[in-house]
């Protein structure tokens, strides 16, 4: 490929602390009425002094450890100065000169196999407020309203090195990061609600000439799919400009969900534009060795570790293990199921197909469903005892999922119990053979697929209730015995 994208990400993770970064207002403000979770501190009133949230610092250290970062025992807050309607203080409290962590990495499944994406820095900062645009888009709004509820909500910003080589890798990185912060319990990682936000910096290299375009920042990508789509669009836009011999402007562009294009928002700021200086009202953050050890002991088993254990302990293929451990709740559900039905691979197949299909259709987590390990115990028992076929099991599963009824109850209510009467099935096969001598002759002349005709006949006559394994056995016996 002649043109190669070079991508780095700047990710904001909203922390699930009880209170905001520097005041006692609630941090979970998503569903609150506008401007109801504010105080003099988070709205920057004269004389109000910030007090750092210890839980925010602990969550940042946990995340940094999970991302293999170097933790700095000394870090400091700074003021990032800029004007925007949703920033009442006129500055944002952040960490610029001395971040809490640097030099980490996250391993992902890249386009050419396993790869490390280096993390340049991880630092703490407070969120700004939120502009609500009439018309739901800044480019089409006739006016905007300001909601200050989000001011002061604690964030960690994670900045990667430009190690990402495709839009797909950017999406994979984001998905992996969300999985980690959810495992840690430091954030919901919900992009639709703004708990995980991603800005991407993309440039393009012409591998034939070595020429590299200017860097463009892309914002407003509020789902994993949009991260990939926006970067695909921007890559194509930059390539077309390079092919025309045009210079690519260094700017910030926003993804427009309606038109599926990026639109220019403003020129790209330089770091000097923000006039950073130390925050005089907050003392430095000093972490002891004892504190770091204490936090390290709180780390749970993370997705990669859990996937390796699933392969080792349950004999699962790597693909299964990664899918099951991508969600902490799904992994826990699988292990609970294994306790009552000790058939890991069969359970894995069901969870990765039938369960995930139902969850994705409803856009819910496994913990929000009515499904329990006992449902699988009952379902597998029905199949093992020959009372239902796997076909019937899959047909009733959506109702099991939706209603929470036991499979055996649904089977009984609908009269779906499998027919295992050998004499009845044999009579039906003989009848089919008498009525269709050509199919019999085809089978005997080597066209083994002709047996499918007799299977279909039996299933039609029994409304799909005949035991398929028993039916096939009887058909083979009668056809080869003639």
Swiss-Prot record:
UniProt KW Acetylation keyword: no
Any one Gene Ontology BP term: glutaminyl-tRNAGln biosynthesis via transamidation
EC annotation from Swiss-Prot or TrEMBL: 6.3.5.-
InterPro entries for the chain: Asn/Gln-tRNA_amidoTrfase_suB/E, Asn/Gln-tRNA_Trfase_suB/E_cat, Asn/Gln_amidotransferase, Asn/Gln_tRNA_amidoTrase-B-like, GatB, GatB_C_1, GatB_Yqey_C_2, Gln-tRNA_amidoTrfase_suB_CS
MF term (GO), any: asparaginyl-tRNA synthase (glutamine-hydrolyzing) activity
Domain of life (superkingdom): Bacteria
Keyword terms: ATP-binding, Ligase, Nucleotide-binding, Protein biosynthesis
Catalytic activity: L-glutamyl-tRNA(Gln) + L-glutamine + ATP + H2O = L-glutaminyl-tRNA(Gln) + L-glutamate + ADP + phosphate + H(+); L-aspartyl-tRNA(Asn) + L-glutamine + ATP + H2O = L-asparaginyl-tRNA(Asn) + L-glutamate + ADP + phosphate + 2 H(+)
One of the Pfam families matching this protein, by short name: GatB_Yqey
Transmembrane segment boundaries: none
Function: Allows the formation of correctly charged Asn-tRNA(Asn) or Gln-tRNA(Gln) through the transamidation of misacylated Asp-tRNA(Asn) or Glu-tRNA(Gln) in organisms which lack either or both of asparaginyl-tRNA or glutaminyl-tRNA synthetases. The reaction takes place in the presence of glutamine and ATP through an activated phospho-Asp-tRNA(Asn) or phospho-Glu-tRNA(Gln).
Family named by the database record: Belongs to the GatB/GatE family. GatB subfamily.
Complexes and interactors: Heterotrimer of A, B and C subunits.
Protein name: Aspartyl/glutamyl-tRNA(Asn/Gln) amidotransferase subunit B
Organism per entry: Thermotoga maritima (strain ATCC 43589 / DSM 3109 / JCM 10099 / NBRC 100826 / MSB8)
Gene: gatB
